[in-house]
Amino acid sequence: MMGLCLLEGASAQANERFLIVSWGDVIFGRQGVSKLDTSEKVRQAIEGWRARGVDKVLFRVDDFRVLLFHDVYVDPNIPYLREWARISRRAWEEGLVDTAVNVLKEAGIEAYMWITITDEGAPPEVLFNYGKGLSFRAWQSRFTRENTHVLVCDRSLTPNQRQFHWGVMEYAYPEVRGYMLQTIRAFSDKFPFDGVFLSLRSHSPPPRHADQFGFNEPVVREFKKRYGRDILRQDFDLDQWRELRGEYLTTFLQEVKSHLETTGQKLAVGVQQGEYIGPPFGNMRIQWRRWVSEKIIDELFVGHITRVRSRYPNRAQRGWGYLQNQEEGLGLPPIEEALRRDYGPLCSKHGVKLYVEPGNFYRHHKQPAYGSGAQPPEVGKKLVAEILTIPGVTGIPVRYDDVTESDGKE
């Protein structure tokens, strides 16, 4: 969906084999069953997934989230945009999501809804494009259009100076947490998903600097209360500020978890490697250790990133000021080392399932930002083999194209 391509994983056998179905992506450029644009194709695809040993499916509902809760600006002169609108609305009205969830469960495959909580869109004049002839649709949630102040903002003192990070909300606001929980429930309550997977990725244009945004009024007020510093007018401890902002995301996860406990559904979260949220957001602390040790989450997916540099060449120069950046390997140990030393032991101790996306830890795109360019496939195969030997790793993804039939008539 929306230009974020399918995450590439590996076809090797792990303890569990999970499949990422980015529905809005697979409905384009494909034929036959793999297109998944009708309920019947979904049924046929699931039969193939079961036969090929898929244990869990993360089914992306973001296209339908946009359809229901956002204003979408569709250029009628671009066939791709017209087709997206037509297929998405028809699929929703014909109950494609309900079919997918129920058929998955009948097949003995766990069904998780994948929803993004950091991607509320932007006005048409703001959202990036791919260049001439490759325009991309723009969308913006009605909630953020009507409540612009809830978007994370910069350190400007006056409203006329203030800049916002389009699409990214500040979870310090109770109304933001309430809105997003209701958005999640629009799918998790309506359909019998086994769990909810929260994605921390975004199509939003990145900040000019990793610490540019995060100075909303609730954060300013709480920081002053705790530390006696006005972060709009005085110098302050950046690490304390980054940690405080991360606490609000943790609060949101606790609220989601509390609701899911009433429905018997599990909570999974996808993050980049490391202690910070990273590109294209900033240096907000990701309190994954607390999430695991307090069992706020049931499953942790490591390596789940936006890939702003490899996917979007027009944004390749924007990675600046990040303390940790998985895409560039900045400030991070090799993922194998982190899994053995940090993630694996802690997740095993507290009974939290640990999944890894190996395809996001080696370079298989040729982009100038990487200097040496793409790495050979052998690098990825070696990495997968190593990850499969690490205690505590529950599973890795299988590639969509490896388990889904692509032939047949439209």
Enumerate the language-model features and the residues they cover.
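Catalytic domains of carbohydrate-active enzymes, especially glycoside hydrolases
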Residues: 40-67, 190-195, 296-302, 387-396
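Aromatic- and glycine-enriched glycan-recognition loops and surfaces
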Residues: 34-52, 79-105, 178-182, 247-254, ...
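Substrate-binding cleft of secreted/luminal carbohydrate-active enzymes
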Residues: 56, 296-315, 326-336, 342-345, ...
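Active-site-adjacent "subsite" loops/lids of carbohydrate-active enzymes
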Residues: 16-39, 113-190, 365-376
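Aromatic-lined carbohydrate-recognition surfaces of secreted/lumenal glycan-active proteins
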Residues: 110-122, 197-204, 240-284, 351-363
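Short, acidic/polar
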Residues: 33-50, 176-187, 279-294, 373-389
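Aromatic-lined carbohydrate-binding/catalytic grooves of carbohydrate-active enzymes
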Residues: 54-92, 209, 306-329
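An active-site-proximal structural segment forming one wall of the substrate-binding cleft
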Residues: 45-54, 100-105, 168-203, 386
